[in-house]
Amino acid sequence: MAKEKIRIRLKAYDHRILDQSAEKIVDTAKRSGAKVSGPIPLPTEKSVYTVLRAVHKYKDSREQFEMRTHKRLIDILEPTPKTVDALMRLDLPSGVDIEIKL
């Protein structure tokens, strides 16, 4: 495959699981003979939700919750068919969202 690259975007709420998954992908790609760029940390998305503490009144008493979405980007340059096959067989945790673009 000439002049091709595979771009992998990983998303997760837990950054430790995300980094472990990224290392697995990089290690698998390097073992199969492809050049790897990354993992590149992308900006963390932070969603803040404000909820009233009381059920009926007391609007001044509120509670805030936040959800952080961590993201990583991995580019696999010059992938071989062996690389693609190895990535398809890779077993990653269920808490990691993977987006692959060829």
UniProtKB/Swiss-Prot annotation:
It comes from the Bacteria. Signal peptide: none annotated. Belongs to the universal ribosomal protein uS10 family. Involved in the binding of tRNA to the ribosomes. Gene3D superfamilies: Ribosomal protein S10 domain (3.30.70.600). GO terms for biological process: translation. Keywords: Ribonucleoprotein, Ribosomal protein. HAMAP family: Ribosomal_uS10. Part of the 30S ribosomal subunit. InterPro entries: Ribosomal_uS10, Ribosomal_uS10_CS, Ribosomal_uS10_dom, Ribosomal_uS10_dom_sf. GO terms for molecular function: structural constituent of ribosome; tRNA binding. GO terms for cellular component: ribonucleoprotein complex; ribosome. The keyword Ribonucleoprotein applies. This is Small ribosomal subunit protein uS10.
